[in-house]
Protein backbone atom coordinates (compact mmCIF):
# COMPACT_ATOMS: atom_id res chain seq x y z
CA UNK A 1 0.00 0.00 0.00
CA UNK A 2 1.52 3.37 -0.99
CA UNK A 3 2.35 5.65 1.89
CA UNK A 4 -0.32 8.34 2.23
CA UNK A 5 2.42 10.96 2.55
CA UNK A 6 3.07 10.68 -1.20
CA UNK A 7 -0.49 11.93 -1.77
CA UNK A 8 0.13 14.77 0.68
CA UNK A 9 3.09 15.81 -1.47
CA UNK A 10 0.74 16.22 -4.44
CA UNK A 11 -1.23 18.88 -2.60
CA UNK A 12 1.05 20.56 -0.07
CA UNK A 13 4.56 22.03 -0.54
CA UNK A 14 6.85 19.32 0.81
CA UNK A 15 3.78 17.35 1.84
CA UNK A 16 3.16 19.49 4.91
CA UNK A 17 1.53 22.67 6.16
CA UNK A 18 4.41 23.51 8.52
CA UNK A 19 8.01 22.70 7.50
CA UNK A 20 9.36 20.71 10.45
CA UNK A 21 6.59 18.13 10.02
CA UNK A 22 8.39 16.94 6.89
CA UNK A 23 10.98 15.30 9.19
CA UNK A 24 13.80 16.08 6.77
CA UNK A 25 16.46 16.64 9.42
CA UNK A 26 15.91 13.08 10.72
CA UNK A 27 15.45 11.56 7.25
CA UNK A 28 12.27 9.57 7.81
CA UNK A 29 9.01 9.38 5.90
CA UNK A 30 6.66 11.47 8.03
CA UNK A 31 3.77 9.60 9.64
CA UNK A 32 0.32 10.65 8.47
CA UNK A 33 -1.93 10.60 11.53
CA UNK A 34 -5.39 9.05 11.41
CA UNK A 35 -6.30 9.29 15.10
CA UNK A 36 -4.79 10.10 18.48
CA UNK A 37 -5.71 9.50 22.10
CA UNK A 38 -3.90 9.95 25.39
CA UNK A 39 -0.17 9.54 24.85
CA UNK A 40 -0.19 7.93 21.41
CA UNK A 41 -1.23 8.41 17.81
CA UNK A 42 -1.88 5.95 14.98
CA UNK A 43 -0.67 6.55 11.44
CA UNK A 44 -2.15 5.66 8.06
CA UNK A 45 -0.14 2.42 8.04
CA UNK A 46 -1.82 1.32 11.26
CA UNK A 47 1.31 1.77 13.37
CA UNK A 48 1.03 3.29 16.83
CA UNK A 49 3.59 5.73 18.26
CA UNK A 50 4.09 7.01 21.79
CA UNK A 51 4.01 10.75 21.25
CA UNK A 52 6.55 13.07 22.89
CA UNK A 53 5.84 15.95 20.51
CA UNK A 54 2.25 16.53 21.63
CA UNK A 55 1.38 18.99 18.87
CA UNK A 56 4.60 20.86 19.64
CA UNK A 57 3.84 21.29 23.32
CA UNK A 58 0.17 22.19 23.01
CA UNK A 59 -1.16 19.00 24.61
CA UNK A 60 -0.11 19.01 28.25
CA UNK A 61 -3.17 16.83 28.98
CA UNK A 62 -2.53 14.49 26.06
CA UNK A 63 -4.59 13.84 22.95
CA UNK A 64 -8.39 13.91 23.04
CA UNK A 65 -8.77 14.49 26.76
CA UNK A 66 -12.43 13.67 27.56
CA UNK A 67 -13.03 16.87 29.54
CA UNK A 68 -11.70 19.09 26.75
CA UNK A 69 -13.56 17.12 24.07
CA UNK A 70 -16.79 17.49 26.05
CA UNK A 71 -16.25 21.25 26.31
CA UNK A 72 -15.79 21.42 22.53
CA UNK A 73 -18.90 19.30 21.91
CA UNK A 74 -20.98 21.56 24.12
CA UNK A 75 -19.51 24.60 22.41
CA UNK A 76 -20.45 23.26 18.98
CA UNK A 77 -24.09 23.36 19.98
CA UNK A 78 -23.76 27.12 20.54
CA UNK A 79 -22.00 27.90 17.26
CA UNK A 80 -18.57 27.54 15.67
CA UNK A 81 -17.73 31.20 15.11
CA UNK A 82 -19.50 34.51 15.66
CA UNK A 83 -17.16 37.30 14.61
CA UNK A 84 -18.49 39.15 17.66
CA UNK A 85 -17.53 39.43 21.30
CA UNK A 86 -18.75 36.27 22.99
CA UNK A 87 -19.60 35.04 26.45
CA UNK A 88 -16.94 32.35 25.98
CA UNK A 89 -14.20 34.97 25.49
CA UNK A 90 -15.15 36.83 28.64
CA UNK A 91 -15.44 33.65 30.68
CA UNK A 92 -12.04 32.43 29.48
CA UNK A 93 -10.38 35.77 30.23
CA UNK A 94 -11.79 35.62 33.76
CA UNK A 95 -10.42 32.10 34.15
CA UNK A 96 -6.93 33.13 33.00
CA UNK A 97 -6.79 36.20 35.24
CA UNK A 98 -7.95 34.14 38.22
CA UNK A 99 -5.61 31.22 37.55
CA UNK A 100 -2.50 33.32 36.91
CA UNK A 101 -3.47 35.84 39.60
CA UNK A 102 -3.19 38.70 37.12
CA UNK A 103 -4.08 42.06 38.61
CA UNK A 104 -7.15 43.95 37.45
CA UNK A 105 -5.04 46.71 35.90
CA UNK A 106 -4.11 44.31 33.08
CA UNK A 107 -5.92 43.45 29.86
CA UNK A 108 -5.66 40.62 27.36
CA UNK A 109 -6.30 40.20 23.65
CA UNK A 110 -6.93 36.81 22.06
CA UNK A 111 -5.63 35.74 18.66
CA UNK A 112 -5.28 32.40 16.87
CA UNK A 113 -1.54 31.73 16.54
CA UNK A 114 1.69 32.38 18.37
CA UNK A 115 3.04 34.18 15.30
CA UNK A 116 0.13 36.63 15.43
CA UNK A 117 0.64 37.23 19.13
CA UNK A 118 4.37 37.93 18.95
CA UNK A 119 3.88 40.11 15.89
CA UNK A 120 1.25 42.08 17.81
CA UNK A 121 3.50 42.36 20.87
CA UNK A 122 6.36 43.99 18.94
CA UNK A 123 3.97 46.23 17.01
CA UNK A 124 2.51 47.28 20.34
CA UNK A 125 5.99 47.99 21.73
CA UNK A 126 6.74 50.23 18.76
CA UNK A 127 3.42 52.00 19.11
CA UNK A 128 3.83 52.64 22.83
CA UNK A 129 7.46 53.80 22.71
CA UNK A 130 7.46 55.35 19.23
CA UNK A 131 10.85 53.70 18.71
CA UNK A 132 11.90 51.51 15.76
CA UNK A 133 14.28 48.77 16.94
CA UNK A 134 13.38 45.30 18.24
CA UNK A 135 16.03 43.13 19.90
CA UNK A 136 15.72 39.35 19.88
CA UNK A 137 18.16 36.56 20.70
CA UNK A 138 19.81 34.16 18.28
CA UNK A 139 18.17 30.74 18.28
CA UNK A 140 14.94 31.98 19.81
CA UNK A 141 11.90 31.43 17.62
CA UNK A 142 8.98 33.83 17.82
CA UNK A 143 6.97 32.78 14.78
CA UNK A 144 7.35 33.38 11.06
CA UNK A 145 6.78 37.12 10.85
CA UNK A 146 9.56 38.78 8.83
CA UNK A 147 10.71 40.81 11.84
CA UNK A 148 11.85 37.61 13.60
CA UNK A 149 13.39 35.60 10.77
CA UNK A 150 17.07 36.08 11.41
CA UNK A 151 19.58 34.14 13.48
CA UNK A 152 17.36 31.09 13.86
CA UNK A 153 18.35 27.47 13.41
CA UNK A 154 16.87 27.15 9.89
CA UNK A 155 18.47 30.35 8.60
CA UNK A 156 19.34 28.74 5.27
CA UNK A 157 15.65 28.54 4.30
CA UNK A 158 14.95 32.25 4.55
CA UNK A 159 14.57 34.39 1.45
CA UNK A 160 16.92 37.31 0.99
CA UNK A 161 13.92 39.65 0.94
CA UNK A 162 13.74 39.33 4.71
CA UNK A 163 16.93 41.41 4.86
CA UNK A 164 14.74 44.46 4.28
CA UNK A 165 13.54 44.25 7.89
CA UNK A 166 16.89 43.55 9.49
CA UNK A 167 18.01 47.15 10.11
CA UNK A 168 15.09 47.33 12.55
CA UNK A 169 15.72 43.93 14.18
CA UNK A 170 18.89 43.16 16.08
CA UNK A 171 19.68 39.57 17.07
CA UNK A 172 22.13 39.05 19.93
CA UNK A 173 23.61 35.85 21.41
CA UNK A 174 21.38 34.24 24.04
CA UNK A 175 22.91 34.22 27.54
CA UNK A 176 25.46 36.95 26.73
CA UNK A 177 24.29 39.58 29.21
CA UNK A 178 27.41 41.74 28.97
CA UNK A 179 27.02 42.18 25.20
CA UNK A 180 23.32 42.95 25.64
CA UNK A 181 24.15 45.62 28.23
CA UNK A 182 26.78 47.16 25.94
CA UNK A 183 24.32 47.33 23.05
CA UNK A 184 21.59 48.83 25.21
CA UNK A 185 24.01 51.43 26.54
CA UNK A 186 24.64 52.50 22.96
CA UNK A 187 21.19 52.30 21.35
CA UNK A 188 18.72 51.65 24.19
CA UNK A 189 17.02 54.98 23.55
CA UNK A 190 16.00 53.64 20.10
CA UNK A 191 14.90 50.17 21.24
CA UNK A 192 11.13 49.69 21.34
CA UNK A 193 11.17 46.22 22.80
CA UNK A 194 13.26 43.19 23.69
CA UNK A 195 11.58 39.84 23.04
CA UNK A 196 12.90 36.61 24.54
CA UNK A 197 12.04 33.02 25.36
CA UNK A 198 12.49 32.49 29.12
CA UNK A 199 13.49 28.91 28.30
CA UNK A 200 14.50 28.31 24.71
CA UNK A 201 12.64 25.48 23.01
CA UNK A 202 13.44 26.01 19.34
CA UNK A 203 17.16 25.34 19.31
CA UNK A 204 16.49 22.43 21.61
CA UNK A 205 16.04 23.20 25.29
CA UNK A 206 18.55 25.90 26.24
CA UNK A 207 18.27 27.31 29.75
CA UNK A 208 19.03 30.91 30.70
CA UNK A 209 22.10 31.48 32.83
CA UNK A 210 21.45 32.95 36.30
CA UNK A 211 20.63 36.65 36.09
CA UNK A 212 20.17 36.74 32.30
CA UNK A 213 16.38 37.20 32.28
CA UNK A 214 16.48 39.64 35.19
CA UNK A 215 19.21 41.59 33.40
CA UNK A 216 17.03 41.97 30.31
CA UNK A 217 13.99 43.17 32.24
CA UNK A 218 15.96 45.50 34.50
CA UNK A 219 17.77 47.10 31.56
CA UNK A 220 14.52 47.58 29.67
CA UNK A 221 13.12 49.46 32.65
CA UNK A 222 16.14 51.76 32.68
CA UNK A 223 15.94 52.55 28.96
CA UNK A 224 12.17 52.76 28.65
CA UNK A 225 12.11 49.78 26.29
CA UNK A 226 9.39 47.14 26.77
CA UNK A 227 10.37 43.62 27.81
CA UNK A 228 8.36 40.93 26.01
CA UNK A 229 8.40 37.41 27.46
CA UNK A 230 7.35 34.85 24.84
CA UNK A 231 5.58 32.16 26.87
CA UNK A 232 3.98 30.42 23.90
CA UNK A 233 5.82 27.23 24.91
CA UNK A 234 6.42 27.73 28.64
CA UNK A 235 3.10 29.29 29.64
CA UNK A 236 0.98 26.92 31.78
CA UNK A 237 3.70 24.25 31.37
CA UNK A 238 6.77 24.89 33.52
CA UNK A 239 4.79 26.03 36.57
CA UNK A 240 1.34 27.28 37.53
CA UNK A 241 2.39 30.81 36.65
CA UNK A 242 4.53 29.81 33.68
CA UNK A 243 8.15 30.94 33.42
CA UNK A 244 7.25 34.46 34.55
CA UNK A 245 6.51 33.10 38.02
CA UNK A 246 10.08 31.80 38.26
CA UNK A 247 11.62 35.29 38.12
CA UNK A 248 11.34 38.13 40.64
CA UNK A 249 11.13 40.81 37.95
CA UNK A 250 8.08 40.66 35.69
CA UNK A 251 8.10 41.56 31.98
CA UNK A 252 6.00 44.34 30.51
CA UNK A 253 4.23 42.09 27.99
CA UNK A 254 3.41 38.38 28.14
CA UNK A 255 2.63 36.26 25.08
CA UNK A 256 0.75 32.95 25.35
CA UNK A 257 -0.21 30.15 22.95
CA UNK A 258 -0.19 26.35 22.57
CA UNK A 259 -1.60 25.06 25.90
CA UNK A 260 -3.80 28.17 26.03
CA UNK A 261 -6.05 26.69 23.32
CA UNK A 262 -6.33 23.17 24.70
CA UNK A 263 -5.42 21.77 21.27
CA UNK A 264 -7.33 24.36 19.24
CA UNK A 265 -5.81 27.54 17.73
CA UNK A 266 -5.54 30.25 20.38
CA UNK A 267 -2.95 32.76 21.53
CA UNK A 268 -2.94 35.94 23.56
CA UNK A 269 -1.06 39.10 24.46
CA UNK A 270 -1.40 40.31 28.05
CA UNK A 271 -0.04 43.51 29.62
CA UNK A 272 -1.05 46.41 31.86
CA UNK A 273 -4.00 48.41 30.51
CA UNK A 274 -1.69 51.40 30.04
CA UNK A 275 0.04 49.36 27.32
CA UNK A 276 -2.90 47.32 25.99
CA UNK A 277 -5.08 50.37 25.45
CA UNK A 278 -2.74 51.42 22.64
CA UNK A 279 -4.43 48.66 20.60
CA UNK A 280 -7.30 49.56 18.26
CA UNK A 281 -10.10 50.45 18.62
CA UNK A 282 -9.00 52.43 21.69
CA UNK A 283 -5.52 53.28 20.49
CA UNK A 284 -3.52 53.72 17.30
CA UNK A 285 -1.90 50.25 17.06
CA UNK A 286 -3.91 48.12 14.63
CA UNK A 287 -4.54 44.41 15.15
CA UNK A 288 -7.45 42.32 13.92
CA UNK A 289 -8.48 38.74 13.18
CA UNK A 290 -11.60 37.08 11.82
CA UNK A 291 -11.22 34.07 14.11
CA UNK A 292 -9.60 35.82 17.07
CA UNK A 293 -11.28 34.63 20.26
CA UNK A 294 -12.97 31.77 18.42
CA UNK A 295 -15.63 30.40 20.80
CA UNK A 296 -14.64 26.76 20.35
CA UNK A 297 -11.00 27.57 21.11
CA UNK A 298 -12.10 29.59 24.14
CA UNK A 299 -14.15 26.63 25.42
CA UNK A 300 -11.27 24.21 24.89
CA UNK A 301 -8.82 26.61 26.49
CA UNK A 302 -10.97 27.12 29.56
CA UNK A 303 -11.26 23.35 29.98
CA UNK A 304 -7.48 23.00 29.59
CA UNK A 305 -6.79 25.57 32.32
CA UNK A 306 -9.41 23.97 34.56
CA UNK A 307 -7.48 20.70 34.33
CA UNK A 308 -4.29 22.53 35.28
CA UNK A 309 -6.08 23.69 38.43
CA UNK A 310 -6.46 20.13 39.68
CA UNK A 311 -4.68 19.37 42.93
CA UNK A 312 -0.99 18.45 42.55
CA UNK A 313 -1.13 18.84 38.75
CA UNK A 314 2.40 20.22 38.43
CA UNK A 315 3.70 17.91 41.14
CA UNK A 316 2.40 15.00 39.08
CA UNK A 317 4.05 16.35 35.93
CA UNK A 318 7.33 16.80 37.77
CA UNK A 319 7.19 13.22 39.02
CA UNK A 320 6.55 11.95 35.49
CA UNK A 321 9.55 13.94 34.24
CA UNK A 322 11.82 12.66 37.00
CA UNK A 323 10.79 9.01 36.76
CA UNK A 324 11.19 9.01 33.00
CA UNK A 325 14.32 11.08 32.46
CA UNK A 326 16.48 10.51 35.57
CA UNK A 327 17.42 6.90 34.63
CA UNK A 328 18.35 8.08 31.13
CA UNK A 329 20.55 10.80 32.65
CA UNK A 330 22.20 8.24 34.91
CA UNK A 331 22.91 5.94 31.97
CA UNK A 332 24.50 8.81 30.04
CA UNK A 333 26.71 9.78 33.00
CA UNK A 334 27.79 6.21 33.76
CA UNK A 335 28.48 5.21 30.16
CA UNK A 336 30.37 8.35 29.24
CA UNK A 337 28.70 8.60 25.83
CA UNK A 338 28.91 12.10 24.27
CA UNK A 339 25.30 13.12 24.94
CA UNK A 340 23.81 15.85 27.09
CA UNK A 341 20.19 15.62 28.19
CA UNK A 342 18.77 19.05 29.01
CA UNK A 343 15.39 19.22 30.71
CA UNK A 344 13.22 21.65 32.58
CA UNK A 345 9.56 21.61 33.52
CA UNK A 346 8.74 18.57 31.32
CA UNK A 347 10.54 19.90 28.23
CA UNK A 348 13.64 17.94 27.19
CA UNK A 349 16.25 17.67 24.45
CA UNK A 350 19.16 15.40 23.59
CA UNK A 351 22.31 17.20 22.41
CA UNK A 352 25.07 15.03 20.99
CA UNK A 353 27.82 16.96 22.71
CA UNK A 354 29.67 16.47 25.98
CA UNK A 355 28.79 19.98 27.14
CA UNK A 356 25.43 21.60 27.71
CA UNK A 357 24.95 24.34 25.09
CA UNK A 358 24.12 27.85 26.25
CA UNK A 359 23.50 29.56 22.92
CA UNK A 360 22.86 28.93 19.23
CA UNK A 361 26.53 28.68 18.22
CA UNK A 362 27.11 25.96 20.81
CA UNK A 363 23.95 24.15 19.70
CA UNK A 364 25.19 24.19 16.11
CA UNK A 365 28.40 22.42 17.20
CA UNK A 366 26.40 19.37 18.31
CA UNK A 367 26.52 16.28 16.11
CA UNK A 368 23.30 16.19 14.10
CA UNK A 369 24.34 13.02 12.23
CA UNK A 370 24.34 11.01 15.44
CA UNK A 371 21.04 12.60 16.43
CA UNK A 372 19.57 11.44 13.13
CA UNK A 373 20.65 7.86 13.76
CA UNK A 374 19.38 7.99 17.33
CA UNK A 375 16.05 9.37 16.17
CA UNK A 376 15.61 6.74 13.47
CA UNK A 377 16.32 3.90 15.91
CA UNK A 378 13.70 5.18 18.35
CA UNK A 379 11.17 5.91 15.61
CA UNK A 380 11.39 2.37 14.25
CA UNK A 381 10.39 1.13 17.70
CA UNK A 382 7.36 3.40 17.96
CA UNK A 383 8.76 6.44 19.76
CA UNK A 384 7.92 9.83 18.28
CA UNK A 385 10.12 12.62 19.58
CA UNK A 386 9.95 16.07 18.03
CA UNK A 387 11.63 15.35 14.66
CA UNK A 388 14.55 17.77 14.77
CA UNK A 389 17.73 18.17 16.83
CA UNK A 390 16.63 21.79 17.28
CA UNK A 391 13.21 21.19 18.83
CA UNK A 392 12.13 20.35 22.36
CA UNK A 393 10.14 17.23 23.16
CA UNK A 394 7.37 17.25 25.75
CA UNK A 395 5.76 15.18 28.47
CA UNK A 396 2.10 15.22 29.47
CA UNK A 397 -0.08 13.90 32.26
CA UNK A 398 -1.46 11.41 29.74
CA UNK A 399 1.81 9.48 29.49
CA UNK A 400 1.21 6.12 31.13
CA UNK A 401 3.80 4.42 33.31
CA UNK A 402 3.78 1.39 31.00
CA UNK A 403 4.50 3.47 27.91
CA UNK A 404 7.09 5.58 29.72
CA UNK A 405 8.95 2.47 30.86
CA UNK A 406 8.96 1.13 27.31
CA UNK A 407 10.05 4.47 25.84
CA UNK A 408 12.76 4.83 28.46
CA UNK A 409 14.29 1.50 27.49
CA UNK A 410 14.04 2.27 23.78
CA UNK A 411 15.72 5.67 24.18
CA UNK A 412 18.56 4.20 26.24
CA UNK A 413 19.15 1.49 23.63
CA UNK A 414 18.90 4.00 20.77
CA UNK A 415 21.41 6.33 22.44
CA UNK A 416 23.86 3.47 22.93
CA UNK A 417 23.44 2.24 19.35
CA UNK A 418 23.82 5.68 17.81
CA UNK A 419 26.92 6.53 19.85
CA UNK A 420 28.53 3.17 19.10
CA UNK A 421 28.72 4.22 15.46
CA UNK A 422 30.88 7.27 16.23
Curated annotation (Swiss-Prot):
Catalytically driven reaction(s): (S)-4-amino-5-oxopentanoate = 5-aminolevulinate
Native source organism of the sequence: Chlamydia muridarum (strain MoPn / Nigg)
One annotated GO molecular function: transaminase activity
Keywords: Cytoplasm, Isomerase, Porphyrin biosynthesis, Pyridoxal phosphate
Enzyme Commission (EC) number: 5.4.3.8
Compartments, as annotated in UniProt: Cytoplasm
Assigned GO CC terms: cytoplasm
Pfam families for this protein: Aminotran_3
Modified residues (N6-(pyridoxal phosphate)lysine): 258
UniProt name for this protein: Glutamate-1-semialdehyde 2,1-aminomutase
Record's subunit section: Homodimer.
Enzyme class: isomerase
SUPFAM superfamilies xref list: PLP-dependent transferases (SSF53383)
Family from the record: Belongs to the class-III pyridoxal-phosphate-dependent aminotransferase family. HemL subfamily.
One of the GO BP terms on file: protoporphyrinogen IX biosynthetic process
Cofactor(s), by name: pyridoxal 5'-phosphate
PROSITE patterns per the UniProt record, alphabetical: AA_TRANSFER_CLASS_3 (PS00600)
Pathway(s) annotated for this protein in UniProt: Porphyrin-containing compound metabolism; protoporphyrin-IX biosynthesis; 5-aminolevulinate from L-glutamyl-tRNA(Glu): step 2/2
Amino acid sequence: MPHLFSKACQYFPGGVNSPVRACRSVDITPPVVTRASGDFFTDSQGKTYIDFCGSWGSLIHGHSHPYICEAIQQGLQRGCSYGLTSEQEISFAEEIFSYLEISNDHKIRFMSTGSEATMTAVRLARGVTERPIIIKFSGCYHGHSDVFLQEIHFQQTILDTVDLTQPLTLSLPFNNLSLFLDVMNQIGHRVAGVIFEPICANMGVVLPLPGFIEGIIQTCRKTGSLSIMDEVVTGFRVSKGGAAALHPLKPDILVFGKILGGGLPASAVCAPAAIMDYLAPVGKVFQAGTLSGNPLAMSAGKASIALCREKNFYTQLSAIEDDFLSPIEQMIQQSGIPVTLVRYGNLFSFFFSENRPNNLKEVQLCNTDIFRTFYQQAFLKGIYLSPSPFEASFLSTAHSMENLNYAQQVLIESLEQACSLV
